[in-house]
Amino acid sequence: MSNRVVIIGRPNVGKSTLFNRIIGKRYAIVEDYPGVTRDKIEAKAEWAGKEFIIVDTGGLVPETKDELIREVKKVVEQEIPKADVILFVVDGKEGLNPLDQEIAKYLYPYADKVLLVVNKIDNLRQEKNVAEFYTLGFEKIFPISAQHGKGVGELLDEVVKYLKEEKVETVEEGIKVAFIGRPNVGKSSLVNAILKDERVIVSPIAGTTRDAIEIPFRWKDKNFILIDTAGVRRPSNVEYGIEFYSVGRSLKAIDLADVCCLVIDASEGPTRQDKRLGGLIERRYKGCVIVANKMDISPWSEEELEGIIRKELFFLDFAPIVFTVATKGKGVEELLNWIDVVYKDYTKQHKTSFVNRAVHKILSEKPPPRYRGKEVKVYYAFQESTKPPTIVLITNYPDAWKENYKRFFIKKLREYLNIKYAPIKLVIKGRED
């Protein structure tokens, strides 16, 4: 097992700030109120020649009645036994809190690998606050300022003493899959069903997943990187701050993905927001699988719902539809199989001679309308790139290619190039271009 360093503590003590400081970039969302990081986030880190996985957990609040915090507590408790080092973070500016004492009780069985991190020690006056934390009973205490980096180097020097000399096993390449959808349609449940691990907190509270979490995964000798994102809400429902930042990350996840799983609620059918999200995927030329989740409570049969989806999301006509019940694991294997199929089409490359034959076959069947009374010709065609498959046509009249004809042309290209389940980007240029 790879070296694992787990950051835990009650909400708003600076765990995510420390996480970001260690990995050197803004990964977890940081805001000044409790509960901002609600999911477990992992990233690769290195210090003094040793590599490790750093884990940022949600806030641990024992005995809380709040449903969400209970879920986070469970995740953290699952992580503690697997950790090589536990960074127990407390707030040195605020001082010792009763919740710190409650959390400490959970950690006493693992005291030999606990480093007590007193954060927010920004000046000499605050350094006096460190002494009271010795009452928690942990031997090694490190005053730091995660925000300014003070003391973090000394902390990491101690961390690496606990680590084994090994390389972190990571999936450097893989099919990047983003789960996109409105809040509470079951994206995190799908990720959990795939991973068979409660890595992402699942709660019926809409908007639970705030961070975009990249999770390497292997299935049937194929590498995947699953990206679980915050539910995307319409702008009118998003206030500035934490949700705004998460929506931006969700859109970024679409840009990073090879295949987007557009998750819709089968009990509601496709909504206006689903259409908007589908439009984002289409305009970015991403591979797509439409996932109709919660089929166990859908008022429609699979055949009926497929007809509705095809009508409402007609612009994603290349995307296969998978019906799932994520909480029961139903449809997960089929989903993974379709992701693989879509990716194969998304990365398909054809020789120029093959592309030219396909293009001229389409033109012979139905040429574009004449332009100002003149014949529209294609001098040659070629595939410029993949992800998406991009076909370039060199023509005498680029302006003659209207949208209706381009849609027809792309549909026929998909047939003749055997790219059935991925978008094709068509680029039309004149000779002078």
Curated annotation (Swiss-Prot):
Entry's Gene Ontology BP terms: ribosome biogenesis
Pfam families: KH_dom-like, MMR_HSR1
Residues at which GTP 2 binds: 181-188, 228-232, 293-296
Molecular-function GO term, any one: GTP binding
Presence of keyword Lyase: no
Residue numbers binding GTP 1: 9-16, 56-60, 119-122
Superkingdom assignment: Bacteria
InterPro entries: G_ENGA (IPR031166), GTP-bd (IPR006073), GTPase_Der (IPR016484), KH_dom-like (IPR032859), KH_dom-like_a/b (IPR015946), P-loop_NTPase (IPR027417), Small_GTP-bd (IPR005225)
Residue ranges of domain KH-like in the record: 348-432
Domain EngA-type G residues, every copy: 3-167, 175-347
Database matches in PROSITE patterns: G_ENGA (PS51712)
This protein's UniProt keywords: GTP-binding, Nucleotide-binding, Repeat, Ribosome biogenesis
KW Repeat (keyword) present: yes
Family: Belongs to the TRAFAC class TrmE-Era-EngA-EngB-Septin-like GTPase superfamily. EngA (Der) GTPase family.
Subunit structure: Associates with the 50S ribosomal subunit.
Function, in words: GTPase that plays an essential role in the late steps of ribosome biogenesis.
Name by which UniProt lists this protein: GTPase Der
Top-level taxonomy: Bacteria, Pseudomonadati, Aquificota, Aquificia, Aquificales
